[in-house]
Amino acid sequence: MKSQHDSLPSSCSALIAQPSRSGITGTVALADGRYLGYAEYGDPGGWPLVFFHGTPGSRVLARLAAAQARLAGIRLLAPERPGYGLSTPQPGRRLLDWPDDVRQWADALGLDRFAVLGVSGGGPYAAACAWQLPDRVSVAGIVSSLAPKDAMLSSLPRLQQCLAQLVRHTWLTGPALPLLAALARRWPANLITVLAWSLPPADRAILAQPDVQQLHLDSLMEAFRQGSQATAAELALFSRPWGFSVAAVQVPVFLWHGIADRLLPVAMGRYLANQIPDCQARFLPDAGHLWIFQGYLEVLATLRRSAR
């Protein structure tokens, strides 16, 4: 059976597929033969904002801001990292492999200058692109992000420190992730219950909204389309040094982090805000990890207003 990728002629660098929930889905061929899947929402001729999903996650998550992006004249694009959704796996990848993938993908789509927005596990990738592509990235947004390994461990309670150390060993974390994937496919309502169990009240209220639940499930289904290996590899990647200092980022950065975030404690956001030279941070009282679902209007407006 041929996949969408198999049908691409060798000379083709990008393919636009079927319209999807008021957006489009496509793939871009990279120099090494891999493909990056992506979704595009909003105004096709608008100001480009590149959205990096969380872990696990997929291009689908950008749908949360599709309507507002269209009204605001924003071209919202969401590439998927290797192994997620439509993107080809990249064994042994490093955090700093991503900016070059983004550069090639942006070239194929005719994007010269653009903003980046990383949410949760997408935050480190937004920082990496801001550091490595200062000639392409006009402004960066970082929401509810984790921090580099040393700062991450010091900010976590002891039990979570132990769990964070375990993700370095994919043979330990690997068996649990297929169970999460199966839960998403077969018992989605149960998955929402599991996700909500340890969340603060603000996050539980957000996750109780039917449209948010459906968006989460759609994103997870795409995240696990090829299995759980991409998530296991990414968790291990986050436990290693990033390969650059966030103190060397020269692009303007706007950061948001909920003070009540139990998944990635606010200490991580404070670390990034203190280290990044040109960073304006907002720490949100009573907000948890899912604040982006109610705060995306503020984020889009801030980044659009601040782009150079």
Q: Would you name each region that the model predicts?
A:
Residues 43-46, 53-58, 120, 259:
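Active-site glycine-rich loops that stabilize anionic/oxyanionic intermediates
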Residues 69-89:
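Conserved alpha/beta-hydrolase
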Residues 97-115:
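Conserved acidic catalytic loop of the alpha/beta-hydrolase fold
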Residues 113-155:
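Conserved hydrolase catalytic core segment
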Residues 160-244:
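Alpha/beta-hydrolase
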Residues 278-308:
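Catalytic active-site module of serine/aspartate enzymes centered on a nucleophile-bearing elbow/loop
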